[in-house]
Amino acid sequence: MVQTKHFCMLHRTLLCPKRIKFLQSISKLKRHITQIHAFVISTGNLLNGSSISRDLIASCGRIGEISYARKVFDELPQRGVSVYNSMIVVYSRGKNPDEVLRLYDQMIAEKIQPDSSTFTMTIKACLSGLVLEKGEAVWCKAVDFGYKNDVFVCSSVLNLYMKCGKMDEAEVLFGKMAKRDVICWTTMVTGFAQAGKSLKAVEFYREMQNEGFGRDRVVMLGLLQASGDLGDTKMGRSVHGYLYRTGLPMNVVVETSLVDMYAKVGFIEVASRVFSRMMFKTAVSWGSLISGFAQNGLANKAFEAVVEMQSLGFQPDLVTLVGVLVACSQVGSLKTGRLVHCYILKRHVLDRVTATALMDMYSKCGALSSSREIFEHVGRKDLVCWNTMISCYGIHGNGQEVVSLFLKMTESNIEPDHATFASLLSALSHSGLVEQGQHWFSVMINKYKIQPSEKHYVCLIDLLARAGRVEEALDMINSEKLDNALPIWVALLSGCINHRNLSVGDIAANKILQLNPDSIGIQTLVSNFFATANKWKEVAKVRKLMRNGAMEKVPGYSAIEVNGELRTFLMEDLSHHEHYHMLQVLRNLKTEIRDVCSGVE
C-alpha cells in the first residue's frame, strides 16, 4: 500500500513537463534517455507536448546518439518547426550537412513554415559543402517568408558568399541590410582579408570603427592578415599594440598570425622573437616562420628551422613544405628540393598548389624537364598551373615553347590573364622574338581585352631595347605616356648601353635621375652609361648623389650546394680561406674556355 502511494506520487511528479525536461538535460547515458522516452510515450506526453519532443531529440544529440534522435523524430505523429529545428541542430553538430538540407526540403514539402533559426542553420549547411546554388535558393525562400532583414540569416548568407568567392554579391547584400551587428562586420573584414583583397578589408574595418563597433580577436586576425598582404608595417604594429594594451588573450592562433604578418612586411627578426616567446607552438606556427625565412631570402635559416621542427616531433604540413621549396628555389638546392618532393609523395596527397611550387623549384634549379613532368601529371590544370609552367619556360628563355604552351592552354578553354601575358612577353623578350612579342601584345589588348599594366610595357620595351630598336621603344614610351614609369626607362637604358645608342641613352639616363631612384643598382647603371659616353661630369654628379644618399649596395652573392652543404659566396669577399685557390681554378677555366672557343673559330 505504501509502495503504491509512493509510485503514484512519483508518477505525478514526472508528469510535470518541467521535471521531464530537467531529467533530459542531466541524462548522459542512452539507457536513461530510452527510459524517459518510454515514460513520455506511456503517459501521452510525446503526443501532447512539442517541447518535450524537441528536448528529447536535443538530449539524444547531446550524447551523440544521432540515429536514436532520428528514430524519435520519425515516430512523432506531429512535427512543428521547433521539432524540425531540434533535429537540424543535431545533424549540424554531427557535421552532417546533407541531412540538414534533406530535412529542410522535407519541412518545405510538409508545408511547415521555417523560422530564422531554420534558415540560418540550413544556409550554414550549404556553407559546409560550398553549395552556393542551394544556399541562394534557401535565401530566396527566407526573403519570401519575411526574413530579408533578419541579422542572423543575413550574416549566414554573407559568410556563404565570402567563402564561395562571391565578394561583390556579399558587398551588395551588406549594403542593403537594415541592421548590422558585429558578426556581420567581422564577416566582411575577415572575408576580404582571406580572399587577398586587403584594401577592402581595411576599408570595411574603418567603416566598422566609424559605426562604433568594438574590435574583437577575429577582426584583429583579419587585420593582421591584411597588414601582411599589403606590407603595411604601421597597421600591423598598431594591431599588435592594441592586442597588448587591451589584454586580449594571446593564444597560439593570434601569435602565429603575428609571426606571419611580421615576416611578410620584412621584419623577420621581430617575427623570430615573437615565435621564440610562444608558450605553445603548432605545425602551423613553424610553417609561418619557415615560410617567412624563405620569403625574406634566408634559405639557410628556413632549412635549419625545418630540422629543428622535426627534432621536436612536429611533422611539416604542405604549407611548410611549400616554404621549404621556395628556399630551395632561391639557392638552387636541387638535392634538398628532391628530398622534399619525395617526402610529399610519401606523407601527403600532392595538390595543385604544391605541384606548382615543385614546378617552380625544379625550373629555378635548372631541372626544367622535371617541371614539365610534374605539369603533365597534374589532373585538372587551372590557370595558376598553366601560368607557372609558362613562367618556367620563360625563365629559361624558351620563347617558342612558351607560345606552344599558351596555345595548348587556350585550346583547353583556360582564359589567360595578365600574369599569363607577362610571362609570355618576358620569355619572348629573353628569346629576342620581337615580332611575336608585338603580335601577342596586340592579341592581349584586342582579343582578350586585357589593359596592359606597367609590367607588360616593361616586357615590350625590354624586348625592343634588347633587339636594338631603342628609337621605336622611345616612341612607344612617349605615345603611351609612360614617362613616369622608372622600370621602363631602366629597360630602355640597358638596351642603349648594350647597343651603344648614346643619344637615346642620354634621354633615358636623365629621365631616371629626374625620377630620383633610391636603388643603388639603378644609379650604378646610370653612372656606367655616362662613363661609356665619356660624360665624366655627369659620372661625378651621380656618384656624389650616391654618397650623399649614404646608400650602400647590398653585395651580390651566389649559393651552391656541395656534398649536402650550402656554400654562399659574396661579391668581392676576400675572407674565404680558399680564396686564392678558387681564383686559380677560375683562371684555369678561363684559359680552357678561350682555347675551346678559338678551336671552334
UniProtKB/Swiss-Prot annotation:
PPR repeats lie at residues 49-79, 80-114, 115-149, 150-180, 181-215, 216-250, 251-281, 282-316, 317-347, 351-381, 382-416, 417-452, 453-487. GO terms for biological process: RNA modification. The keyword Repeat applies. Keywords: Mitochondrion, Repeat, Transit peptide. Residues 1-80 form a transit peptide. The keyword 4Fe-4S does not apply. It is found in: Mitochondrion. InterPro entries: E_motif, Pentatricopeptide_rpt, PPR_At4g14850-like_plant, TPR-like_helical_dom_sf. Residues 488-563 are annotated as: Type E motif. One of its GO terms (cellular component) is mitochondrion. Residues 564-594 are annotated as: Type E(+) motif. GO terms for molecular function: RNA binding. Its main location: mitochondrion. Belongs to the PPR family. PCMP-E subfamily. This is Putative pentatricopeptide repeat-containing protein At3g25060, mitochondrial. It comes from Arabidopsis thaliana. The gene is PCMP-E96.
